[in-house]
Swiss-Prot record:
The keyword Cell inner membrane applies. It comes from Agrobacterium fabrum (strain C58 / ATCC 33970) (Agrobacterium tumefaciens (strain C58)). The keyword Ion transport applies. This is ATP synthase subunit delta. It is found in: Cell inner membrane. The lineage of its organism: Bacteria, Pseudomonadati, Pseudomonadota, Alphaproteobacteria, Hyphomicrobiales.
Amino acid sequence: MPVAETSQGTSGVAERYASSLFELALEAGTVEAVQVELDKFGALLDESDDLKRLVASPVFSAEDQFKAISAICEKAGIAGLAVNFLKVVANNRRLFAVPGMIRAYRTIAAAHRGEITAEVTSAHALDEAQETELKAALKSVTGKDVAISVTVDPSILGGLIVKVGSRQIDTSLRTKLSTLKLALKEVG
């Protein structure tokens, strides 16, 4: 679990940075473009253990992180406000909070569009058809357009965990097995 998900202080940092970035993107008229670029960086982060270590480890200096982020963004074609933002974050030694910043930006942008954001945890990546079906199901329940933020966590074994606002629906196999284990302990 990334540091950004385990610390309340980090959440505040992530939200402040995301809010500042959103204001700049709104002024520049690039809210959607910045979200696409951040999502691209988030996908790189999900796929690369080395990048996760760079982001999470205090061992790397701000200069090392800045150079690495610059090179990664250039190679990935991440440009404009998003790359400048990531460089500032690296310079300020806040890369550990980038996953939270991306989630917070996505939530702020969705709220600006009149959508709500659902955080979805799945044991494996969802294909486009599954995402579309999930969005439709959530829209029928909430009555609003829903943007989904998918996190892959193989430890849930199967099923989904869906968080919309303060509500959570946990259909993960891990939770079902834990419930069964507790029930069996009570019986025997």
